[in-house]
């Protein structure tokens, strides 16, 4: 494809993204020093290549998924997005990893007015410290602190009432012998270590291990923010079937998890266009993702879900810098 055809395709897609109306040769002739007849010939070539097509109700042309793919891969000029540093520091807190992840999803949604998603880090089930607190007769609160500083609570049903001194003894034993290990590793070595303790304390410790392992597996793998903003996107909200598919994607999350998992193994920003990528189940939807990590190690992925007709040159740098900001926030928490 020659430079003239590439320039016309770029202009057509940019115009369509801007106003959502099929683009005709007369419109493009105002941009290029070419006759409408010449432009129609070029558009016919682009249509033959599968890059644009004509809706039934219009003589103009709109981009196909393949056209969008060529646009984002080789025609798009992306500039760095400018943030106010102080403002971002407030939006991505470093005090708690879970807060930073939720804030990143909200930031993506607020800046793009689409849905922001974050694939949360896979839990390693490692704990730094645990504590037992007596709640009432035969009820004990288990407090688990992860190496990242996250705090998780579980209520244990005990077989008898424990004194505060006994619970302190059990917690100290656990922290001295098992801190820095996973609950699965603790489970494997528990029998020999617990021989040093009374039988009733051993049962409490075993209950703590099971609750800790369960806590590590709990929680949403995907954090989603702003999905309702897609109700304001005409390309999606104007069709009830599209809306049902969209919210089914958010509800079931299987396809979304697969896409985010695949993108976490890729380098840098990835753009998945519906109709072009099998990972996106809807032709009217695009997903832009970027991996984030701690100290150079990728631990998750985040992104934006929006219409295929989106301002890619604006959304791409937002996703990129949010991934960098989240990585920075999580690294500072170590």
From Swiss-Prot:
Domain of life: Bacteria
Keywords: Repressor, Stress response, Transcription, Transcription regulation
NCBIfam families from the UniProt entry: hrcA
HAMAP family according to UniProt: HrcA
GO aspect biological process, one term: negative regulation of DNA-templated transcription
Family from the record: Belongs to the HrcA family.
GO molecular function: DNA binding
Organism this protein belongs to: Bordetella pertussis (strain Tohama I / ATCC BAA-589 / NCTC 13251)
Keyword Repressor found: yes
Stated role: Negative regulator of class I heat shock genes (grpE-dnaK-dnaJ and groELS operons). Prevents heat-shock induction of these operons.
Pfam families tied to this protein: HrcA, HrcA_DNA-bdg
Name of the protein in question: Heat-inducible transcription repressor HrcA
Family matches, as InterPro entries: GAF-like_dom_sf, HrcA, HrcA_C, WH-like_DNA-bd_sf, WH_DNA-bd_sf, WHTH_HrcA_DNA-bd, WHTH_transcript_rep_HrcA_IDD
